[in-house]
């Protein structure tokens, strides 16, 4: 089966105050830190106003949300990746998860079993649907939800066959799953990063 890596970078970053994808941490943009966990061949889904900025940074495969679902959140981003690329399994990652490790993403990919539509980790009791693997066969379900403007990803998970994985069972540190939504989250990055080094 053909595998596609997808980085979602289309959020408005309202709570953060500026586009999170391009915020520098330890000399790299946050999206670059997340992308490292996916590998070199990565498709980026973003907002129209960010496309040029990604391309100026050397990213070649960058798309905006497919019509008619522009600006409709992560589900639109996943749908767009399905529509724009030729793949079967899609590793999906949000750009504001800079501490996620490549080994964790590879373990999730390894755990995709026959018949499952998705592999989704759970860390500290929290389901992590934007650090996950999805099969393209869910595309009609995605289309229906987007058409109905049902944008909660939890609704999607309730309609497909999901293999849930406890993060500790694949050797993942809870710190990997930090999601940068606010400046306070960003200020905690160093501490969380240090806990990864001690692991």
UniProtKB/Swiss-Prot annotation:
Write the record's keywords in alphabetical order, separated by commas.
Cytoplasm, GTP-binding, Magnesium, Metal-binding, Molybdenum cofactor biosynthesis, Nucleotide-binding, Transferase
Q: What is this protein called?
A: Probable molybdenum cofactor guanylyltransferase
List localization entries: Cytoplasm
Free-text comment about domains: The N-terminal domain determines nucleotide recognition and specific binding, while the C-terminal domain determines the specific binding to the target protein.
The signal peptide, as residue positions, is none
Q: Name one GO biological process term.
A: Mo-molybdopterin cofactor biosynthetic process
One term under GO cellular component: cytoplasm
- Which cofactors does this gene product need? Mg(2+)
An example Gene Ontology molecular-function term: nucleotidyltransferase activity
**InterPro entries in the cross-refs:** MobA-like_NTP_Trfase, Molybde_CF_guanTrfase, Nucleotide-diphossugar_trans
Q: Does the keyword Disulfide bond apply?
A: no
Its biological purpose is as follows: Transfers a GMP moiety from GTP to Mo-molybdopterin (Mo-MPT) cofactor (Moco or molybdenum cofactor) to form Mo-molybdopterin guanine dinucleotide (Mo-MGD) cofactor.
The protein's annotated catalytic reaction(s) are: Mo-molybdopterin + GTP + H(+) = Mo-molybdopterin guanine dinucleotide + diphosphate
As for family, the record states:
Belongs to the MobA family.
- Which Pfam families does UniProt cross-reference here? NTP_transf_3 (PF12804)
What domain of life? Bacteria
What EC designation does it have? 2.7.7.77
For the ligand (GTP), the binding residues are 8-10, 20, 65, 96
Positions with a binding annotation for Mg(2+): 96
């Amino acid at each position: 089966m053909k595998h596609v890596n997808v980085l979602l970078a289309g959020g408005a970053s309202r709570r953060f105050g500026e586009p999170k994808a391009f915020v520098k941490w330890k000399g790299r943009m946050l999206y670059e830190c997340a992308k490292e966990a996916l590998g070199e061949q990565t498709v980026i889904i973003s907002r129209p106003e960010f496309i040029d900025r990604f391309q100026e940074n050397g990213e070649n495969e960058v798309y905006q949300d497919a019509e008619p679902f522009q600006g409709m959140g992560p589900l639109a981003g996943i749908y767009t990746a399905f529509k724009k690329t030729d793949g079967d399994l899609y590793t999906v990652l949000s750009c504001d998860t800079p501490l996620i490790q490549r080994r964790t993403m590879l373990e999730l990919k390894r755990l995709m079993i026959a018949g499952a539509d998705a592999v989704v980790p759970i860390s500290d009791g929290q389901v992590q649907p934007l650090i996950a693997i999805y099969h393209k066969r869910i595309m009609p379900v995605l289309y229906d939800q987007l058409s109905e403007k049902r944008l909660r990803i939890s609704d999607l998970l309730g309609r497909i066959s999901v293999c849930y994985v406890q993060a500790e069972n694949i050797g993942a540190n809870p710190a990997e799953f930090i999601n940068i939504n606010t400046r306070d989250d960003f200020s905690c990055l160093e501490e969380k990063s240090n806990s990864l080094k001690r692991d």
